[in-house]
């Protein structure tokens, strides 16, 4: 099998997707993603130095390439004279068996097609799902999620998680008081005063392997909380503005997080303090806005060590998010997307603070 040819085709589809959807991102969000993509394509990690002049030349070349490809359709993947739908991850992964590679595909924010090929470092069974953990990624697009669910497989991307961890580390070091992030890192043997070293980078990897469970359980929660999933997908497809889509996805994420099958329930059941601190440190922007009760509950937990506060907040958050989902689906059936958007504006008065 021509692995280089397959990777080249996937990379081309990644670039087509980026060419068609880069304009949906904020300026800051786009620049951040472009830097991450540059690092990936040059086999660099977030803590590696990227020469400014080289990055600038790459950016110019990529923008020119986007101009050529912005109207091009995604290509089928040709392997051994046969064509495969780029979203048929199951079929393509059957071809990759024995290669120690894994292929992932799906849809990201703004219904953007997203693809990657990564080195398979581990796989295991969890409930009814196969969980694939990837290391170095040979190709990817601008959208890179820590985990994604495709069919009966959950893909967990260690490089993406390590990038998230390093970003939190940098943010913590820039602040006078590290807060919950400092406590999270302390659980994994990382101090605010640590300087970049081989040992510290190794600790980032160990930490990524540990907190990957949060992302795995989120995807499991999403899979099991599939009531009205087809209708919800129709709502998202009909939604054509960032504000509404962010809240719709935020509601779905909150249901997954607070589900009986989600990460918070698993954390409380195991009494896993390090993972709880990690969950809180990774909670930001819109997710905090939709789930304010977890902040008060966490403070009580810090003071008393009693898990009942976290479990109570999880249950209340779940019921709240389920109510929002039911209202959205009812309005979708009764009044269409305009009724849904009106409801979202009235229910969530503050615009999201996250930059897509």
Language model features by range: what are they?
Residues 223-252:
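Post-HEXXH active-site segment of zinc metalloproteases
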Residues 210-227:
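Active-site recognition of the HExxH zinc-binding catalytic motif
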């Amino acid at each position: 099998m021509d692995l280089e040819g397959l990777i080249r085709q996937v990379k081309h589809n990644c670039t087509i997707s980026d060419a068609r959807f880069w304009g949906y991102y904020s300026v800051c969000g786009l620049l951040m993603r472009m830097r991450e993509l540059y690092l990936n394509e040059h086999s660099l990690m977030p803590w590696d130095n990227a020469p400014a002049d080289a990055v600038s030349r790459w950016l110019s070349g990529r923008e020119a390439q986007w101009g050529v490809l912005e109207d091009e359709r995604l290509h089928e993947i040709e392997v051994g004279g046969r064509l495969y739908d780029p979203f048929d991850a199951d079929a393509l992964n059957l071809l990759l068996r024995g290669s120690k590679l894994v292929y992932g595909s799906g849809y990201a924010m703004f219904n953007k097609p997203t693809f990657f090929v990564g080195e398979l470092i581990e796989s295991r069974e969890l409930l009814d799902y196969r969980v694939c953990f990837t290391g170095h990624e040979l190709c990817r697009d601008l959208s890179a999620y820590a985990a994604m669910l495709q069919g009966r497989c959950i893909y967990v991307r260690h490089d993406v998680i390590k990038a998230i961890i390093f970003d939190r580390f940098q943010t913590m070091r820039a602040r006078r008081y590290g807060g919950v992030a400092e406590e999270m890192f302390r659980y994994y043997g990382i101090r605010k005063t640590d300087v970049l070293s081989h040992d510290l980078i190794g600790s980032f990897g160990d930490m990524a392997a540990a907190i990957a469970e949060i992302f795995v359980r989120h995807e499991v929660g999403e899979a099991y909380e599939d009531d009205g999933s087809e209708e919800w997908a129709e709502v998202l497809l009909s939604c054509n503005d960032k504000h509404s889509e962010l809240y719709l996805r935020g509601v779905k994420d909150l249901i997954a997080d607070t589900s009986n099958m989600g990460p918070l329930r698993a954390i409380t059941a195991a009494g896993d303090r390090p993972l709880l601190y990690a969950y809180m440190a990774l909670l930001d922007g819109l997710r905090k806005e939709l789930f304010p009760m977890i902040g008060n509950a966490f403070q009580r937990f810090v003071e008393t060590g009693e898990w009942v506060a976290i479990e109570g907040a999880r249950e209340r958050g779940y019921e709240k998010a389920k109510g929002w989902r039911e209202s959205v689906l009812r309005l979708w059936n009764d009044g269409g997307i305009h009724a849904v958007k009106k409801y979202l504006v009235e229910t969530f008065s503050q615009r999201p603070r996250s930059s897509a």
